Amino acid sequence: MDENESNQSLMTSSQYPKEAVRKRQNSARNSGASDSSRFSRKSFKLDYRLEEDVTKSKKGKDGRFVNPWPTWKNPSIPNVLRWLIMEKDHSSVPSSKEELDKELPVLKPYFITNPEEAGVREAGLRVTWLGHATVMVEMDELIFLTDPIFSSRASPSQYMGPKRFRRSPCTISELPPIDAVLISHNHYDHLDYNSVIALNERFGNELRWFVPLGLLDWMQKCGCENVIELDWWEENCVPGHDKVTFVFTPSQHWCKRTLMDDNKVLWGSWSVLGPWNRFFFAGDTGYCPAFEEIGKRFGPFDLAAIPIGAYEPRWFMKYQHVDPEEAVRIHTDVQTKKSMAIHWGTFALANEHYLEPPVKLNEALERYGLNAEDFFVLKHGESRYLNNDDENF
């Protein structure tokens, strides 16, 4: 966090009482009924960490989180330098707005022109892609966001760092009422300070934040009051919507925002389990055995949001970012009926051509005997409504 960000956060935090909920518990405690109240410190409804066959979060000797699978390799400084200096960048993002508008149009979301239609109240599910890993999900009488970033840059500063080449389809003020936000990890393209501040200013303590273990203090400094911090396999709910369960589930990634804070915060995916629908958000991840575990416990899902971009060069990126073929493997592992593509077409974060991910996705789907509707790609601002009553759902 830069100095301006720190000062802004201190000023903002003084507007709210420091009553964020630290849902931290020992796995040996009783597993009784959960209370999704903002001030609850009771145990969880069901702690899946008590099951011996789930992969639990793990810390190294230095107290920092580590990936527990052999599929992981740390991104060393020499390898980072090799990537930045030696590898050719094939992203080829055009500078022409006209060309970008033709190739990657940004649509006005339905909720701007027809705000009265926001909120799915029947058994259906609707998703709207707002760019990168930001998805607005409407299901089971709730509306929530994943990894919201509405800023121009994914960076500590809005004057440098990765810049959007496709604008956000809407502003935060144009969103319908949001009940919850899911954060997968603390990288700048998934946890955006300005977006957190703006969402908190608009919705206040009526907005519930679900965040990984270790992120609560940062959220408090931003002034967020209604925060639930979870370990892998822990769960909680939005007050008044206890039939919809938000479970923090594993992924293979890492965390860092400042020079010395590597992996002090956990990373993960989210499994949202409702009476009518089940939604999976993969966040940012390399391929690992966790997804079979998630599918075994919570599948089949009705819809999953799975990343397909930022994967080249593979020798460096494969540990932290899946490629389109691995995304299809996740689709299969978590046992989802449909998937939507995220984490592409917004920021140039790796070396593949900016239009390549959907092409590679379709090739992978063919190899797996799936069609484009099984794992679909939306335009920026586009929505997709899925109905449980539909035979093709």
From Swiss-Prot:
EC numbers for this chain: 3.1.4.54
A Gene Ontology term for the protein's cellular component: Golgi membrane
Positions that bind deoxycholate: 256, 260, 348
Cofactor(s) the record lists: Zn(2+)
Binding site for Zn(2+) 1: 185, 187, 253, 284
GO molecular function, one term: N-acylphosphatidylethanolamine-specific phospholipase D activity
Modified residues (N-acetylmethionine): 1
Name of the protein described by the UniProt record: N-acyl-phosphatidylethanolamine-hydrolyzing phospholipase D
Organism: Homo sapiens
Taxonomic path: Eukaryota, Metazoa, Chordata, Craniata, Vertebrata
Gene: NAPEPLD
